[in-house]
Amino acid sequence: MLFWLLLPYFVLVAVLFQAVQRLRSPVARLPGPGYTAWTSLVLKYHEFTHGRRLYIHALHRRYGPVVRLGPGEVSFATADAAKEIYMSGGSGYDKTPFYSLFTQFGTRTLFSTLPRADHSYMKRYLADRYANTNIMKPDILNGISQHARDFLNKCLDQCYGSDGFADIYVSLHCFALDGVTHQLFHPYGTHANRNERDLRLMQELSYHDSLKSNVAIYYMPWLSGVVHYISPPKPAPLSNEYVLKTSALPSPSPFSLLSKLQAQAKATSMAPYAVPAECKDHLAAGVDTTGDALCFLMHHLSLPTPASQRVQGLLHKELAENAAVPFDQLPYLDAVVKEALRCFPPIPMSMPRCVPRGGSTIEGHFIPQGTIVSCQAYTLHKDPDVFPNPLEFLPERWLDKAGEAERNRLFFAFSSGGRGCLGRHLAIAEMKLLLREVYSQCRTTLSSQMNSDMEMEDQIIASRPKGQSCKLVFEKVV
């Protein structure tokens, strides 16, 4: 009886203690809406409803480069902050438990490993597979080029057939799947632009929405069962079967990731599912990112505006007149790809990290240990002091030597530091080879049947075209 009489007082004392702790925290003195000193529920609401990226961007526009998102989370939007968070000590601060959502087959992978020391150890035996020297090998480039030809042939067949248009969202994600599996598994890669089963594999990987269930698992594990019932996560039997079977096949090509992983598994004691888990993680990471970035870019180049048609014309001119020049030595192509990654970064959202023991000073503010800190590419890439007219697609900005260092410091499409995107060189090679194949010989325009929403829609860590469809017409010009 006495316990129940005293319970309200215990609750009141606990609430008051928590309130005092939050008000005394250095985080409470940072810029941001007043409610964020007390709760992160508004942030979680926007995340649950696909709006976290735009919510944070709006806060930065109002409050400046340092914004409190909640009692224990802060967002930054400067090059110095990004350097401190993601590059200090070589690989920046440790990842937060958020990345535990990305385990595969119950096994932690390079991406989902939290402590940077463990990540550094794992990266040592994988990094050379994604080094530019490996990606530039003829065996890899020839394979990607063939997949680019498959993409263009499929699009031309559809345009000159009964459809009269090509849905490049589908074909680009097929191309991205084929490109990444070529590097992962050759000679056991996919041919999704030619093979119906591989097409279904791509659809399983790309046509799903697991944001709500993942957010529930992370923030409210006790509620995840209810959310799973309302919005069940989509199973992935085809991709799981493909990865499990393929990762056990013998004699993969020496340049492949599978070759390196199998050799490592023989030389050391690895977890039972370590090889397929790592392969599945790289497979999932390499499809939507490259496919979405190319889709946003080709849609923009095909818009019926003078600005878009000018860029497409200049790109065609450089590619058509320099057929024998290596793709990595074409300045305008490079500028178009960089501007695409600035305007449509494959992962535009926050990359959360945890402030280490003892706390840190970021942008002149002391941030206590355990605080979640992050930057998001979407906001960094729109700094008007570094990128004048940030909402305009201007490849020429990357050809200007003035301000080059500042632009590169804020370029965050692949994150930065030792934990930045391992596959950046592969992604850029895929984008450039695909664009060269298409725009050296074709012109693209929007189909009259193109009515899909091309706004960015946030997923758990990446964003994609909301309508997941982009209908273009391809016309041969040579």
What are these regions (language model features)?
Residues 176, 180, 264-316, 340, ...:
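Central I-helix of cytochrome P450 enzymes
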Residues 2-121, 145-150, 353, 358, ...:
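N-terminal membrane-proximal hinge/A-helix region immediately C-terminal to the signal-anchor transmembrane segment
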Residues 190, 306-307, 406, 424-465:
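Cytochrome P450 heme-binding "Cys pocket" and the immediately downstream C-terminal segment
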Residues 340, 367-370, 393, 417, ...:
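Hydrophobic, well-ordered secondary-structure elements that form the walls
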